[in-house]
């Protein structure tokens, strides 16, 4: 365990946030690869896998989730990502979770106060997300549900939510996006350069 983790006495959870189609899971895989030498047991939780069947069914039928659909799911995201962090030597995990509204992020924080959550928002324009969703296969979130995600999206005010960062995606290569996210993780979460 690093000295930083010992003194904080908390688990650390990196939350890759943003609308569908922003590459949260793909970036998570890149983070696992990037940090495998210093965090060999780093765990990734796919937040979509934690949705109850009723939520998946609703989204599969093209019906957007409402707040009531999300509360238990968000609590489960907080609990499972904290368990994943607790199971690693360095007490660190990564979770992909849209975390679209401030009240969702607040619920995650308050559900597991023993964890320090850092939300990294992958933000792309509607045009970019639509392009990505149209080429995506095998996922219940379809392009026609994008509007509801953008309607719900409350990008964090990083002066108010100091545990949040926004990484813009438009007009960047995947390599540049990956590099930007890695830099945020190093400087804001792991405190390494």
Swiss-Prot record:
Superkingdom assignment: Eukaryota
GO terms under biological process: D-gluconate metabolic process
Catalytic reaction list: D-gluconate + ATP = 6-phospho-D-gluconate + ADP + H(+)
Pfam families the record matches: APS_kinase
Broad class of enzyme this protein falls into: transferase
Pathway as given in its UniProt record: Carbohydrate acid metabolism; D-gluconate degradation
Cytoplasm keyword on record: yes
Chain positions recorded as ATP binding sites: 18-25
Primary location group: cytoplasm
GO molecular function terms noted in the UniProt entry: ATP binding; gluconokinase activity
Cell location: Cytoplasm
Key words, A-Z: ATP-binding, Cytoplasm, Gluconate utilization, Kinase, Nucleotide-binding, Transferase
Listed EC numbers: 2.7.1.12
One GO CC annotation: cytoplasm
Keyword flag Phosphoprotein: no
Other notes: Present with 504 molecules/cell in log phase SD medium.
Protein family membership: Belongs to the gluconokinase GntK/GntV family.
Protein name as catalogued: Probable gluconokinase
Organism: Saccharomyces cerevisiae (strain ATCC 204508 / S288c) (Baker's yeast)
């Amino acid at each position: 365990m690093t000295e930083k983790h010992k003194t904080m006495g908390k688990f650390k959870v990196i939350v890759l946030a943003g609308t569908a189609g922003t590459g949260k899971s793909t970036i998570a895989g890149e983070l696992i690869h990037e940090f495998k030498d210093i965090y060999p047991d780093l765990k990734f939780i796919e937040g979509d896998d934690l949705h109850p069947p009723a939520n998946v069914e609703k989204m599969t039928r093209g019906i957007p989730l409402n707040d009531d659909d999300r509360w238990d799911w968000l609590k489960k995201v907080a609990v499972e990502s904290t368990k994943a962090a607790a199971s690693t030597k360095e007490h660190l995990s990564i979770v992909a979770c849209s975390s679209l509204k401030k009240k969702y992020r607040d619920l995650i924080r308050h559900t597991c106060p023993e964890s320090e959550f850092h939300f990294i928002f992958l933000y792309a324009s509607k045009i970019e997300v639509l392009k990505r969703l149209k080429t995506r296969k095998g996922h219940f979130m379809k392009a026609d549900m994008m509007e509801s995600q953008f309607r719900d999206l409350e990008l964090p005010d990083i002066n108010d939510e100091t545990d949040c960062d926004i990484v813009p995606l438009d007009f960047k290569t995947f390599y540049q996006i990956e590099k930007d996210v890695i830099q945020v993780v190093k400087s804001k979460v792991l405190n390494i350069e």
